Regions:
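Alpha-helical/coil-rich non-catalytic "connector" segments in signaling and regulatory proteins
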Residues: 4, 24-25, 32, 49, ...
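Amphipathic alpha-helical segments that form the core helices of the histone-fold
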Residues: 37-57
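Long, amphipathic alpha-helical coupling/dimerization segments that relay conformational signals between
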Residues: 2-15, 64-131
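N-terminal intrinsically disordered, cationic/polar leader segments
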Residues: 4, 8-16, 20, 28, ...
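Generic alpha-helical propensity signal that fires on short helical segments
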Residues: 32-34, 39, 104, 109
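Hydrophobic alpha-helical core bundles mediating ligand binding, dimerization, or RNAP-core interactions
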Residues: 25-29, 49, 53-56, 99, ...
Length: 131
């Protein structure tokens, strides 16, 4: 008799895998010369991520027809980055890395995810990153 694997939500996986996902984001970010040209410590470079992921996880757990709240953390992060010397294109690159790191985590754990809900959650992630 086969053991049935427990299905987890995207929000659950992202919450559980927060630290490895942030570590992957930092690794990818440190490979982009445009970003590393601004001298920041690893802590300064990724301090915004726990709150951004908390906002994303909260949004993933909302009912699908609920109007999403505005991410105050994302706006604050943009302001801080501007003060640190980031350009708009650098912020876009950070957002792209956020999305790729998030999807990489989901890919690693895809066997735990409900395929019927995955695509709609990916759409929420893409919308949140683009907001």
């Amino acid at each position: 008799m086969m053991k049935q694997q427990k299905v987890a939500s995207v929000a659950t996986i992202l919450k559980r895998e927060l630290q490895p996902t942030i570590k992957e984001w930092l690794r990818r970010g440190n490979l982009v010369p445009e970003l590393t040209d601004v001298p920041l410590s690893d802590t300064d470079r990724n301090a915004h991520l726990p709150k951004l992921y908390a906002d994303l996880i909260c949004r993933l757990r909302l009912a699908k027809d609920t109007h999403p709240p505005v991410s105050i953390a994302a706006a604050a992060h943009g302001k801080i980055r501007r003060e640190q010397g980031y350009s708009a294109s650098m912020l876009i690159e950070e957002s792209r890395i956020f999305q790729v790191s998030t999807f990489s985590t989901l890919h690693v754990h895809q066997s735990e995810l409900d395929p019927a809900k995955l695509l709609s959650d990916v759409m929420v992630i893409a919308d949140e990153v683009d907001a």
